[in-house]
């Protein structure tokens, strides 16, 4: 609207200027007026028009100043023949306009020079109108003085408005307020309407997009349906030809259906497998039915084979190095001395466990490779899981209807699905047969193992009465445990531990191996791919066990101090030898009875020669302690680790509690029949046997320790970062073919 008004005003000004010039006596042909057309043509100065502009300026100023004055003003500059005269003419016109502005005849303006230079635009038209209006007044005054005196011109409207300004001001303000309110109301309505339309547009756009997507989806489904219909029609014709031409189809269909039903019937057994001790073995988790026997046997072999001088020198070197490290950290060597001896002894044990891969059988005289039962079960179960996953993938083919087994039967050759399914089932049957062989051999070995355990039990029960004073005082042992439970730590470590460890290195244990070597067919390669990662896991396990040993170091310090006070200065050599001899037996019994704490739970990642004995933990394993010892509060796994130290715990067992250690151990190897007779409710390994003689307090004590000793999963994720990556056994040819298929 504003632009239209400005254009209308420009046109009115130009038309009024032409009218004034015509009144002053301008020739109509100059502005293009003919005899017939009475209205002047406008828009002549929209573009630069210096010729017409100079002519109009000369005419208006000549009319204003008279012929005599104008001849003087425009001498030598009019008429214009070149650009120099044009510049001089504009200078003369600028001087006359400045004079008129100084007299008040024209309003002042800063754009006179540019307007005169261009001779176009609304400002130049306004200048011509102002000059023509002023010239018309002056000419009218000079020509008709009597008329001017009798009929004076009215005063300008600007002066009248100024005289009534006081009255018009409040009215103008009120009108401004009213217009403002009206504008704000209209603006608010417009904003609301715009928001409403915008929301409606968004909703319509979203609905349109949804409809487009639905249309595209329905179109795709329609195309799929048409393709499927055509495919079914084509395959139906081929199938009809096959049914009519072949007589073996019914037999193949029935066989395939029977095989498929057997696979689908056994599909639910994988979920039960994932929650039992077999899966604990595969995932390297700690379980109460499992203990690494090879590490303890290797430690006993090494302790009997290493000379005393070498062991003492190794102890001194390790003690010095550990003392230097400890002095750099906190400057307390006394709290570290005992721990350095234990670490050096266990370092020798771990080094010796590598040598037990090819152990010489004393009775047969031939070298038999030690078979890791846990590793065998782990790899077999891993293969079975891969086969199970492949069967599930086959089960999902064709939307759950099973694979098209008879697709290529018409070609005269065997189907690829038939071959893969037959190979899968054959390998499944082979693994199950291998499991049965393992179970049978474990049953054959179990009487010898139990016989060895019973002989060790009889030897422990027939201990001579000439024991060191430590074993005779049960009250002193209970007071040691009470001081250990209450957390009182005594400073200083006795050197008797070093003497005891060095003495243990000279004693030969008669029964080194409690179980004959398992003889199994060579089913897997001797160097699995998981050995490298197992080594990494073993390093992390060693670090975790060292942390737990550091935590329980203060508790062992207090007990060792009490032992050094109660022990005489000079023990007889035969008594010390017998004491250490029986103590080493108790080490093995403690390892077979009491599992390690959660900190050392990953000792299953040792080398391939480690043996694993599946012995259930019964309540009688804890009934050998006195009643006041059971009443002590235990402080988590650290207290249990210190309680299971065989160096000072086992000799404190009274004779009345010793016979009940192995009295309630169930026949675990008979429970392995559950691999054959599978029960969905009980799992694979059932916990058989419970202590009916134990009191309620003993039963509650066993329940508490059961939760501590058999955690379902270690909560320290740093120790289990790549536990499941160790399951990647080498692929067999059948598995590789299944994966490619």
From Swiss-Prot:
Pfam families in the record: HAUS6_N (PF14661)
Localization of this protein: Cytoplasm, Cytoskeleton, Spindle; Cytoplasm, Cytoskeleton, Phragmoplast
Main location per the UniProt record: cytoplasm
A single GO BP: megagametogenesis
Record field: compositional bias (Basic and acidic residues): 315-329
Polar residues compositional bias, start-end: 538-551
Source taxon at top rank: Eukaryota
Coiled-coil portions: 213-239
GO molecular function: microtubule minus-end binding
This protein's record includes keyword Transport: no
Subunit structure of this chain's protein: Part of the augmin complex composed of 8 subunits. The complex acts on microtubules and interacts with gamma-tubulin in spindles and the phragmoplast.
Family: Belongs to the HAUS6 family.
Function: Contributes to the assembly of the acentrosomal spindle and phragmoplast microtubule arrays as part of the augmin complex.
Protein name (Swiss-Prot/TrEMBL): AUGMIN subunit 6
Underlying gene: AUG6
């Amino acid at each position: 609207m504003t632009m239209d008004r400005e254009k209308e005003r420009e046109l009115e000004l130009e038309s009024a200027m032409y009218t004034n010039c015509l009144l002053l006596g301008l020739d109509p042909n100059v502005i293009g007026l003919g005899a017939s057309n009475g209205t002047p043509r406008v828009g002549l100065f929209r573009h630069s028009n210096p010729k017409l502009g100079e002519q109009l300026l000369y005419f208006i100023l000549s009319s204003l100043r008279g012929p005599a004055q104008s001849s003087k003003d425009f001498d030598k500059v009019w008429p214009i023949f070149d650009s120099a005269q044009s510049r001089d003419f504009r200078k003369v016109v600028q001087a006359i306009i400045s004079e008129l502005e100084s007299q008040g005849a024209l309003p002042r303006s800063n754009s006179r020079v540019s307007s005169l230079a261009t001779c176009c635009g609304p400002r130049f038209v306004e200048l011509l109108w102002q000059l023509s209006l002023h010239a018309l007044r002056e000419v009218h005054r000079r020509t008709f003085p009597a008329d001017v005196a009798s009929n004076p011109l009215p005063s300008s409207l600007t002066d009248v408005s100024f005289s009534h300004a006081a009255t018009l001001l409040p009215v103008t303000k009120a009108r401004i307020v009213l217009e403002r309110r009206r504008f704000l109301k209209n603006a608010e309505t417009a904003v609301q309407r715009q928001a409403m339309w915008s929301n409606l547009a968004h909703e319509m756009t979203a609905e349109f997009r949804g409809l487009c997507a639905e249309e595209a989806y329905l179109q795709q489904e329609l195309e799929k349906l048409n393709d499927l219909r055509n495919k079914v029609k084509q395959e139906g014709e081929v199938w009809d030809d096959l049914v009519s031409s072949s007589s073996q189809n019914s037999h193949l269909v029935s066989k395939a259906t029977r095989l498929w039903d057997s696979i689908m019937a056994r599909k639910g057994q994988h979920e039960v497998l994932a929650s039992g001790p077999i899966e604990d073995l595969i995932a390297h988790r700690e379980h109460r039915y499992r203990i690494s026997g090879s590490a303890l046997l290797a430690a006993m072999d090494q302790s009997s084979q290493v000379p005393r001088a070498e062991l003492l020198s190794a102890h001194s070197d390790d003690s010095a190095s550990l003392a230097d490290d400890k002095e750099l950290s906190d400057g307390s060597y006394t709290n570290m001395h005992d721990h350095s001896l234990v670490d050096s002894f266990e370092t020798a044990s771990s080094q010796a466990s590598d040598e037990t891969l090819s152990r010489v059988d004393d009775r047969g005289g031939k070298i038999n490779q030690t078979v890791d039962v846990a590793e065998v079960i782990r790899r077999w179960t891993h293969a079975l899981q891969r086969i199970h996953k492949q069967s599930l993938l086959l089960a999902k083919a064709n939307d759950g209807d099973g694979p098209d087994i008879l697709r290529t039967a018409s070609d005269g050759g065997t189907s690829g699905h038939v071959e893969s399914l037959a190979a899968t089932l054959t390998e499944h049957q082979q693994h199950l047969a291998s499991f049965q062989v393992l179970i049978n051999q474990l049953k054959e070995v179990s009487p010898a193992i139990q016989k060895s355990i019973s002989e060790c039990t009889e030897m422990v029960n027939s201990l001579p009465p000439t024991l060191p004073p430590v074993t005779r005082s049960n009250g002193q042992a209970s007071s040691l445990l009470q001081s250990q439970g209450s957390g009182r730590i005594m400073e200083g470590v006795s050197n008797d531990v070093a003497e005891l460890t060095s003495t243990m290195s000279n004693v030969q244990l008669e029964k080194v191996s409690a179980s004959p070597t398992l003889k199994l067919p060579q089913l897997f390669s001797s160097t699995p791919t998981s050995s490298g990662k197992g080594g990494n896991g073993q390093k992390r396990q060693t670090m975790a066990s060292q942390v737990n040993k550091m935590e329980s170091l203060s508790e062992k310090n207090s007990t060792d101090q009490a032992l050094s006070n109660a022990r005489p200065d000079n023990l007889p050599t035969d008594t010390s030898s017998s004491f250490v001899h029986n103590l080493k037996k108790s080490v093995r019994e403690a390892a077979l009875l009491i599992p390690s704490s959660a900190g050392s739970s990953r000792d299953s990642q040792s080398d391939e020669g480690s043996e694993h004995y599946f012995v259930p933990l019964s309540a009688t394993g804890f009934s050998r302690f006195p009643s006041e010892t059971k009443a002590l509060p235990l402080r988590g796994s650290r207290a249990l680790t210190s309680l299971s130290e065989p160096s000072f715990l086992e000799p404190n067992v009274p004779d009345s509690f010793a016979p009940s250690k192995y009295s309630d151990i169930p026949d675990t190897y008979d429970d392995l029949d559950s691999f054959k007779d599978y029960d969905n409710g009980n799992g694979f390994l059932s916990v058989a046997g419970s202590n009916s003689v134990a009191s309620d307090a003993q039963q509650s004590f066993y329940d508490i320790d059961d939760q501590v000793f058999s955690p379902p999963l270690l909560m320290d994720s740093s120790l289990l970062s790549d536990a499941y990556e160790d399951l990647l056994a080498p692929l067999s040819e059948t598995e590789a073919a299944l994966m490619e298929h």
